[in-house]
Amino acid sequence: MNQRAAGAVYEQQARRYLERAGLTFTAANVTLRGGELDLIMRDRHIWVFVEVRYRRNAHFGDAAASVTRHKQQRLLHAAAVWLAQRGASFDTVDCRFDVLAITGDRFDWIPNAFATQG
């Protein structure tokens, strides 16, 4: 299985995990100028932008640790573009950035992993 196919499998697992937790699916693999949003979900009235990370094991750090400051900035930018396409912004709607880290068979959901102020 190539890396793209494996990513799709883990994103689907993450989607199911979050849906079981009560979030509603909106979109997956949204590519925008400057970045990609793995999952866009809703938690009641809150837009939730989810970065899905997978690591086979934690020998080189867990999956959550791989969401660097640079990656956060790219996610913030992509989400801002996505919201703007819908006539919204971080100032006009509630949103948050979550990380769903999969390390081996362990799922770690980190709501509000970083702030919109970046």
UniProtKB/Swiss-Prot annotation:
InterPro entries in the cross-refs: Restrct_endonuc-II-like, tRNA_endonuc-like_dom_sf, UPF0102_YraN-like
Gene Ontology molecular function terms on file: nucleic acid binding
Coiled-coil residue spans: none
Any Pfam family matching the protein: UPF0102
Annotated PANTHER family: UPF0102 PROTEIN YRAN
Record family assignment: Belongs to the UPF0102 family.
NCBIfam families found in the cross-reference section: PRK12497.1-3, YraN family protein
The protein, known as: UPF0102 protein PC1_0307
Lineage, broadest ranks: Bacteria, Pseudomonadati, Pseudomonadota, Gammaproteobacteria, Enterobacterales
